[in-house]
Amino acid sequence: VENMKYSNLNDGIDEYLKKYEDTFYVSNLDFAIDLIRTGGKKFNLRNTTNYNAENQCFEEKVSGVETLDLVTSFLAELDGDYLQCFTKSFNEGRFDFYNDLENNDKKIRGICSYEGYTVNFNGTISDSRTIIHEFFHSLNIKNYKLAPIFSEMISIFMENKFLDFLNTKGYSRNDIAKSRLARYNDFSGAWNRLIIQSNFLNLKNKIGYLDEESYDFISMHEKELNFPHLSKEDFIEVLEFLDDRIKNSEKIEQAFNPEYSFRYYIGTIYSSYLLLQEDSLDKVLLLNEYLRKPVEETDIESAFRIIGIKDETDFRFI
């Protein structure tokens, strides 16, 4: 295979499939792809926002002390031990602030352990929002079975609730809006990459080696393969692009990582859905507590039921 065309692409995807075969995403590829496609049509993800560099500038300055006060004040309003957990984590050094220069230093970035989080300090509300997001990850990330599915949803939901909290405290509504837009712009920008990589991952998993010669077979069996119609020119263009990206990357995940992108997709879609429900905060906190249980005491069906998703019809609410 090494001497065959597109060997980087094929070998790389084979490696990826083997590494992630037990994940929810890879184990349910056709189902995941249907969700991604439906969401793209429903929300017109190619044109969700018009967010550019000018929109990223926040107006209101927030000091480091004020940032921590905001985080602790928000957590204190939640039922449970969240404030105590954050205080303990912070005092143990699991959250650190760095500026842009320090964050780009490999030595400093390497200091961050698996359970540590660095916050690129900007002196704006984005700092406290990031802390809230990463803090909730830290609470449930050890549940290797369910965290890949639910952790992003919980963190994105809670960061939005935190932005609601900032609004009640009189912080800049423009900055709050920009902060929300940043999340959804990132989401819409990643969607196109996610659907392309998912389609080709699924195709590789079903038919084996991908190259120009496989196009005719694929085009004849698009429905059975759950693969969208592409011209041969577009098909080859994607093959060449992915092959080159994988060839020039040290790790497959640097060039091709749809499982990771899928977490953000599910997290953004379902957190947005839950934000429309009045009792959603209670549901999400209950789900977070469920993920904090020993892994062997949790299962995916129970987790979905906690947030009101009882069957496939509910799951496909979009």
Model-inferred region functions:
Residues N167-A255:
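Long, amphipathic alpha-helical stalk/connector segments used for oligomerization, subunit docking
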Residues Y20-T23, L78-D81, K142-L146, D164-D175, ...:
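Inter-helical turn/loop segments and adjacent helix faces that build the functional surface
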Residues S113-I131, N143-L146:
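Short pre-active-site segment immediately N-terminal to the catalytic Zn-binding motif
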Residues Y144-F187, A303:
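Post-HExxH zinc-binding segment in Zn-dependent metallohydrolases
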Residues V1-G116, K310:
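Contiguous, non-catalytic segments that form substrate-binding/exosite surfaces or channel walls
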Residues T130, E134-S138, K142, M153:
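Catalytic glutamate of the conserved HExxH
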Residues F157-T168, N202, I269-L276:
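Short glycine/serine- and small hydrophobic-enriched flexible loop segments
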Residues K5-G40, L45-N52, Y215-I318:
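C-terminal, non-catalytic "cap/extension" segments appended to globular domains
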